[in-house]
Amino acid sequence: MKKRVNTKFKAFTGIFLILILTLTSSAVNAQKTTREDILKKFKQDKQRIGRTDDEIKETMNSVVADLKKKNKKFTVELNEMMKYKISEITGTKPPSEDELRRLEDEKRKKEEIARKKAEKQRQEELKRLEEERKRREAEINKEADRKKQEEMRRQEEERRKQEERRRNDDLNRAEMNDRNIPADLAPSITLPFFAWNGAKTSTIVQHQGVCGSCWAFTGAAVYETNYLLKNGETLDLSEQAILDCAVDKNGKDAGSCDGGWYGGVFDYMTVKGARTEKEDPYKGKTGFCSSSAKTKYTVIKWGYIRRDAGIPSVKEMKEAISKYGAIAATVKVTPAFQAYKSGVFDEFASVSGANDVNHAITIVGWDDNKKAYLVKNSWGPNWGDKGYIWVEYGSNNIGYGAAWIVVSQ
């Protein structure tokens, strides 16, 4: 009896040990699989966003050879941004032609309504003034006393002047809403050189990292510069909040790390405003909107320099820079653009059309001697010429989608 019990106990113990070994083996395999998956994902991500050493070398050799062959005006270097594929460090997605036409139709309708309303108010005001003039003239005519007539005329003249001043003040306020730079401070477009990139007229160059958020950085950079120009106050806006929260007027996301469009940013800032970097620091990846509360940093008005969002003429671009400050725009980035160090970027790469662009940038000035725009990029101050690049007029579709904004006070 005792021997039979021992036999059963041994059998049970054996089964239990086998079960433990099986579970342990499964756990080890699971752990091993997880690590392998992580390593595999890392390699895939690295392959997706980066160039291999051989690819970098080959790309640089090709760029240098092309520069020498075509005798270009700019120099290049092996910088940090050359390590990444272009698609991972750009990311602008222009609206379709249908979308632009729809937006333009909406804008025209609103402008026509506003025009008719303003004209109606103007006619009513003229009618009121004419009736007032006739009434006072009748009163004056009834007065027999010459001194009284003179006094009444003097009072009438003073009232007229006050009314004129009031109308002029109203016009000045309306004009301020239609421009960001006061007319007496705006640079002349006849200047051969001008740029909003001084210590008192521009904010620091930011770095978007390996995230296609150039559209968000451009939206923030344009607002920061123009707010500084208008109010004399330096801002550091949150690109992360723009990345996570911005939607256009139709409720569509302005973009993500896979690309976007700054038009949606300005739509959002018209309604909600913008948060500061301190409130929502940049993480370099798309997240969840942490706050939708309205802020004081709003856009009063914005629009494209050309109604069809096409590439403006140099004169049109200068006028916008003079009137509004920094301008949001786009360009086609190539390996040569990535490797830019100094000089005037005059690649004139092959393009399929005016909207063949992939990167949002900020245009802050011009130089007619260089025949180029001064562009503020979002790849950090160590890239290019301290974060800036001179791009020759017309090169690589520079200026497509150029847009201006008027910021709050």
Question: What are the roles of these predicted feature ranges?
Answer:
Residues 3-15:
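Bacterial N-terminal signal peptides that target proteins for export
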Residues 13-24:
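Bacterial N-terminal signal peptides
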Residues 26-30:
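Sec/Tat signal peptide C-region and signal peptidase I cleavage site
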Residues 31-409:
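Catalytic-core signature of thiol
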